[in-house]
Every structure is written in structure tokens, then in C-alpha cells.
């Protein structure tokens, strides 16, 4: 408790005007404040910045994606990585805004044209399905995403309105579908395909979260996503010996 009767100790000091009693408390002007030394330690911590709107573009094509008749391939949309220099995303989560899909398919006969008559037709159905994987998961030692049959059942399901199997509905949601019916003479056919999908709305935003276990493992691949990955299902159905070579570009707009 403060004591009102307490007085600062005095000391008799000599000056040009004689002896005077002065308080023993040192003057503030005489105090010297030592500046802290600057840290010379190098820091490689992540640069934290404000979240901003950005986009990432990915192209999927190649021999590993070629489809023969009645086959399918599963893939995913790459998300931005989190870098120490501030590029890409700056948090372990992003807001998905929009996904633009564009590309072509190259269709050709797998057994050549020598067995085909000039008036013969080659027919088939190409399907690209974009799905939201709410809870991304791959068992230990498994690197293959769910196939068309595991998601929708037999290939014949593609001829009508496609619906997920009941066992997959809690985890997956269909965001959009591209269907291209092929009916061509022997040779090569290019079909331009486009799909634009808004992912977030004002009252219904869509967020994705990442595991980011350490600074060296903060990528945008499927295994590092803990919530809301985008899975792609390519499939081709035909009664003829055809090969489909897809070439698609995915442009993802996000806030992160």
C-alpha cells in the first residue's frame, strides 16, 4: 500500500550557491539506455502475407492418359503449394472460387484403316467428370484414385444422367460433366471441349485445407489435402477399336 508519509532520501550536495539538500533519486537524463544488439541469425520461416486472389494453371495429357475402348483414368486438380518466399498460398487453407476446363480429344483407330471401308463410321462416348472429394483419403501403399466403376457403377451408366453410388455420396459430389459423342470416319478427330464452374458463392464459400506437416512438405498434391480435393474421372466407351488421347487445361482461381 502507498505510504503518504514516505519521502525520497536527501543528500547534502555542494554547489556554487553553497550546500543544498537534493534527492538521491538519479536524474533521468543521466540514465543510458543500451540498444539491443541486432540479431544476425538467418531466418527461413514462411513469409506471412495477406490472402489475395490468384490462379494456378495445370495441363493434363500424355501417353499415360490414353484411353482405349471401355477404359478409364482417374486424376486430380493440382492445388498451389505453400512457399517460404510468399509465392503460392500463404496459409494451410484456401478459398476455391472458380474452375475453368478447356481442351480437345484426339480420336483415332487402334487397328489402322486397312480394315475399314470408306463409308464405315467409328463411334463412342468420351466422359470427363469433375468431382469434389470432401474427405480425401488413400490407404497406405495405394496410389490409385477411385475408378469410374467405384464411383458410378458400370460404364452403361454414362449413357444417361450419371449418379454416384449410394456408398460414395457422403464423400463425393459431382461438380460438372463433359460428354462428347464421337461419330466419325476412319482417321483423327479433334473435339473442342469447355466447362466453367463457379465453386464458391456469397452465402456458400468452398474452402480447402491442407495437412502441411513441415516446411518441406507443403505441396498441393492429393495426399497433402485434408479437405475438399477435386478429383477427375476420364472414361471412354465404345464398341469399336478406338484410342482417345485427351489434352485438357485446368485453371483454378482461388484466394490464399
Swiss-Prot record:
Signal peptide: none annotated. A motif (Nuclear localization signal) lies at residues 81-96. Coiled coil: none annotated. The keyword Transit peptide does not apply. It is found in: Host nucleus; Host cytoplasm; Host cell membrane. It is a peripheral membrane protein. GO terms for molecular function: single-stranded DNA binding; structural molecule activity. Binds to the genomic viral ssDNA, shuttles it into and out of the cell nucleus. Begomoviruses use 2 proteins to transport their DNA from cell to cell. The nuclear shuttle protein (NSP) shuttles it between nucleus and cytoplasm and the movement protein (MP) probably transports the DNA-NSP complex to the cell periphery and facilitates movement across the cell wall. Binds to single-stranded and double-stranded viral DNA. Interacts with the host nuclear shuttle interacting (NSI) protein. This interaction may allow NSP to recruit NSI monomers to the viral genome and thus regulate nuclear export of viral genome by NSP. This is Nuclear shuttle protein. It comes from Mungbean yellow mosaic virus (strain Vigna).
Amino acid at each position: 500500500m502507498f505510504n503518504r508519509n514516505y519521502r525520497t532520501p536527501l543528500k547534502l550536495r555542494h554547489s556554487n550557491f553553497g550546500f543544498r539538500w537534493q534527492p538521491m533519486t538519479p536524474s533521468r537524463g543521466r540514465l543510458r539506455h543500451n540498444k539491443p544488439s541486432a540479431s544476425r541469425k538467418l531466418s527461413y520461416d514462411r513469409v506471412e502475407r495477406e490472402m489475395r486472389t490468384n490462379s494456378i494453371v495445370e495441363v493434363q495429357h500424355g501417353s499415360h492418359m490414353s484411353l482405349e475402348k471401355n477404359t478409364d483414368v482417374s486424376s486430380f486438380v493440382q492445388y498451389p503449394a505453400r512457399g517460404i518466399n510468399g509465392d503460392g498460398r500463404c496459409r494451410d487453407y484456401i478459398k476455391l472460387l472458380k474452375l475453368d476446363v478447356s481442351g480437345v480429344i484426339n480420336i483415332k483407330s487402334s487397328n489402322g484403316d486397312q480394315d475399314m471401308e470408306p463409308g464405315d463410321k467409328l463411334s463412342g462416348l468420351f466422359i470427363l467428370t469433375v468431382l469434389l472429394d470432401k474427405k480425401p483419403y488413400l490407404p497406405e501403399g495405394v496410389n490409385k484414385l477411385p475408378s469410374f466403376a467405384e464411383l458410378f457403377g458400370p460404364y452403361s451408366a454414362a449413357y444417361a444422367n450419371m449418379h454416384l453410388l449410394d456408398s460414395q455420396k457422403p464423400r463425393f459430389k459431382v461438380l460438372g460433366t463433359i460428354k462428347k459423342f464421337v461419330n466419325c470416319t476412319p482417321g483423327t478427330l479433334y473435339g473442342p471441349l469447355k466447362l466453367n464452374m463457379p465453386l464458391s458463392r456469397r452465402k456458400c464459400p468452398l474452402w480447402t485445407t491442407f495437412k502441411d506437416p513441415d516446411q518441406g512438405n507443403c505441396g498441393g498434391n492429393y495426399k497433402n489435402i485434408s479437405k475438399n480435393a477435386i478429383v477427375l474421372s476420364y472414361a471412354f466407351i465404345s464398341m469399336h477399336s478406338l484410342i482417345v488421347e485427351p489434352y485438357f487445361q485446368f485453371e483454378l482461381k482461388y484466394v490464399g
